[in-house]
Swiss-Prot record:
The gene is nuoB2. Its EC number is 7.1.1.-. This is NADH-quinone oxidoreductase subunit B 2. It holds the Pfam family Oxidored_q6. The lineage of its organism: Bacteria, Bacillati, Chloroflexota, Chloroflexia, Herpetosiphonales. It comes from Herpetosiphon aurantiacus (strain ATCC 23779 / DSM 785 / 114-95). It catalyses: a quinone + NADH + 5 H(+)(in) = a quinol + NAD(+) + 4 H(+)(out).
């Protein structure tokens, strides 16, 4: 008699076989509590996913927490402005491990139609690591459910010997630097000058997703935009209408 047949016979008698990893992952995947972080119109679709038509509670994620201390996944839904980034990072640092991030919509992923604006960041992954990206403007509730199932699939294959929050945490970043919003833009500790200037391009690569084995480091395969000058910005009271018209005509 094969081991599989023996296992099936014992299961019919109420004896179940599993591993510590499967049991641990099953418990976590079945109760992924989200922290709502609705920043713009994508949050409406996130709210709709929790309503009766889509019923996100089928996946154990109906408890939207207002406290990061009780949340497992941060759903960043909407446009991330530079004034909001410090709050996003600060709340992410307060979440207990294991913690995950879902970037919902084009704005949270890359800035969306506002990516060239003076006040919008070009992706929340410049400041916190993202596990699952959801395209769309805005994504439908089904897309959020698919992202949740994708996150559950990532949890299913995790091993306690390899996850970054269990065991030896050497080299693992647990506290991400909280940016400071200054007069010229976002200043990130550890990055000289203004890391994300107002009206300019960020001078830093995104973080590596933990799903890809990241430990909180930035993606070295993407070249940082060193020396990139910010685009000229019109400040109130510094130019005249004639100067603006001359610039457009030129």
């Amino acid at each position: 008699m094969s081991d599989l047949q023996t296992q099936m016979d014992l299961e019919q008698q109420g004896v179940l076989f599993t591993t510590i990893n499967k049991l641990y992952n099953w418990g976590r995947r079945s109760s992924v509590w989200p922290m709502q972080f609705g920043l713009a119109c994508c949050a409406i679709e996130m709210i709709a996913a929790a309503a009766s038509r889509y019923d996100i509670s089928r996946f154990g994620s109906e408890l939207f927490r207002a406290s990061p201390r009780q949340a497992d996944v941060m759903i960043v839904a909407g446009t991330v402005t530079k004034k909001m980034v410090p709050q996003v990072v600060r709340l992410f640092n307060q979440m207990p491990e294991p913690r995950y991030v879902i970037s919902m919509g084009a704005c949270a992923t890359s800035g969306g139609p506002f990516r060239d604006g003076y006040n919008v960041v070009r992706g929340v992954d410049l400041y916190v690591p993202v596990d699952v990206y959801i395209p769309g403007c805005p994504p439908r509730p089904e897309a959020l459910l698919h992202a949740l199932m994708t996150l559950q699939a990532q949890i299913d294959v995790q091993s306690l010997q390899q996850v970054r929050w269990y065991g030896d945490d050497e080299g693992v970043v647990n506290e991400f630097p909280v940016p400071i919003f200054g007069a010229e833009g976002l200043e990130v500790p550890g990055i000289p000058g203004t890391a994300d200037p107002v009206g300019g391009t960020p001078k830093m690569p995104p973080f590596v997703s933990p799903a890809l084995g990241g430990k909180g480091e930035r993606d070295a395969s993407i070249k940082a935009l060193e020396g990139n000058q910010p685009k000229p910005m019109l400040r109130a009271g510094t130019v005249t209408i004639e100067e603006v018209a001359h610039g457009i005509a030129g």
